[in-house]
Amino acid sequence: MWSCSWFNGTGLVEELPACQDLQLGLSLLSLLGLVVGVPVGLCYNALLVLANLHSKASMTMPDVYFVNMAVAGLVLSALAPVHLLGPPSSRWALWSVGGEVHVALQIPFNVSSLVAMYSTALLSLDHYIERALPRTYMASVYNTRHVCGFVWGGALLTSFSSLLFYICSHVSTRALECAKMQNAEAADATLVFIGYVVPALATLYALVLLSRVRREDTPLDRDTGRLEPSAHRLLVATVCTQFGLWTPHYLILLGHTVIISRGKPVDAHYLGLLHFVKDFSKLLAFSSSFVTPLLYRYMNQSFPSKLQRLMKKLPCGDRHCSPDHMGVQQVLA
């Protein structure tokens, strides 16, 4: 699937053992993501969404953010096979860089990435609010619809401007209105700033404030309504996972934008290397679709009970499913 002919322009280096090992390793990672990661992501993201929607009364604001990330994970899991089976650096590509299919697939990918980043940032800010001011109205699940509308509406509006640049760079010769919007790199720069820099700064700000609150010994720290330590561990693990897996993708977008914006011809060697690393960064980004729900499954203490209540409501023929069904026990174990 993968090729490392970007080492030089001859392609003879592909016979070297190091190149063969690299090709084999990346191909195995891609196949592992398709065979294991995609089904796990679809399964656990769907369970996360259904279990929380079924237990709306016990949902908290962190659960709302994880539901948004799970919906974005479902979209990414559905897109992963098409992206991973046809990167431009592979032997078999399903589309060209400027093709209609690429633009169509880029829309849900960008929206899902923005939703994941926004939800992570809001999760951090909400965690700080709950830590500093327990039982506040702002940290209430009462605002679920407004939060979901803000996250997805903001992601759609943000990606719309980037979509215009992508489309105009493809149909620039057919539409006069696109004459001044033929720069696809502007779309990448917009995504990097609004989709990564802003959420990263918000998350960093929330974590700094949260660390100050945790260091202060106040009477509120003995409040029975305070967040459990497991909630803080889940927050830290989620932030590290999301930004750790998405940072390479946005850094490559930024690097590609800087190189192309110079207006100088780029050597084929470096351009091929850039596309190769870009494909690898997307592989890491897609892996977030199944890593995040697994973190929620194993670090959220209320999820097993929610899943049990959901399974009890599922019909098995003319009777309800038994709570000790083998499949349920395997998921809960």
Swiss-Prot record:
GO terms for cellular component: plasma membrane. It is a multi-pass membrane protein. Its main location: membrane. The chain crosses the membrane at residues 31-51, 66-86, 103-123, 147-167, 190-210, 234-254, 280-300. The keyword Cell inner membrane does not apply. Keywords: Cell membrane, G-protein coupled receptor, Glycoprotein, Membrane, Receptor, Transducer, Transmembrane, Transmembrane helix. Residues 52-65, 124-146, 211-233, 301-333 are cytoplasmic. One of its GO terms (biological process) is regulation of cholesterol biosynthetic process. GO terms for molecular function: G protein-coupled receptor activity. Glycans are attached at N8. InterPro entries: GPCR_Rhodpsn, GPCR_Rhodpsn_7TM, GPER1-like, GPR146. It is found in: Cell membrane. CDD domains: 7tmA_GPR146. It comes from the Eukaryota. Pfam families: 7tm_1. Belongs to the G-protein coupled receptor 1 family. This is G-protein coupled receptor 146. It comes from Homo sapiens (Human).
